Every structure is written in structure tokens, then in C-alpha cells.
Amino acid sequence: MRPIGPIAFCALALCLAGCQTTSTHQFATPAPTWATKSGQLSYQGPKISLIGEVLVRYSKAGELELAFSKGPGVNLLLLRQDAQFASAEGPLAHGRWAGASASAPERLRGWFGLREQILAGRNSIQTNAGGERFNLRF
């Protein structure tokens, strides 16, 4: 009789590999032609409220990179997004997520919703999404 341990281990490894949250999508690298804005972001979520610094870079083609931090060296969230794909990492993302924007987890949808308003060139953004409030000023 064969031991079931190695077979169970292989089956588990294959299942977990299918749960991966990394993406093979390559986001554009920020270039000198990208617009850069810095300011403050007030975030109020269901369990936490934070005010921190935000750095946003975006291209005319719609690629976006947003970094939200609470002082030097305390990165809370790094977002990358284009028209179809998005990625988020950091404590506010509960780790790391990447994939199609349309399939983003509920906890990230409000963050990814900021893209359109930032690309519109607004210097002040106030929005509510899914129990979260964002107040962004450049």
C-alpha cells in the first residue's frame, strides 16, 4: 500500500498555486512625461481612520501609481493601475493583491475608484465608497 502523504501534499500544492494573487501583467514604468502630484489623504474606513501623505504619478495614457504613507518609511499602501489591471500592496491592502480591476476585492474598490478622479486632474477629491471615505488634496 502506498503512503497517501506525498499525494496529498502534491494536491495541496496545486490547489494553493491556483490561489496566487500575483499577476503577470506588466505595468508601465513611470517616465519623465508622467504628471506627479503630492498632497494629503484622509482615509476613514470601517475600522480605522488615517491621515497621511500621498504621492501620485500618472500618464496621459491612464497608468497610475499611488503611494500612501504615514511619514518617512511607514508605507501604508502602494497602488498601480491602468485601464484593465490593478495591484495593491501594504498594510491597508491586507498584504498583496493583483488582477483585473473589475474583480478587485471589496476592501480595495474604493482605492481603485480614485483613479478616474485623479486622471481628471482635480486638485481636491472627496468621495465615499463601500463604507469608506476619501478626502484627497494636492
Positions of predicted regions on the chain:
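Compositionally biased, low-structure terminal segments
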Residues: A8-C10, G113, N135
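Bacterial Sec signal peptide processing site at the extreme N-terminus
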Residues: L16-W34
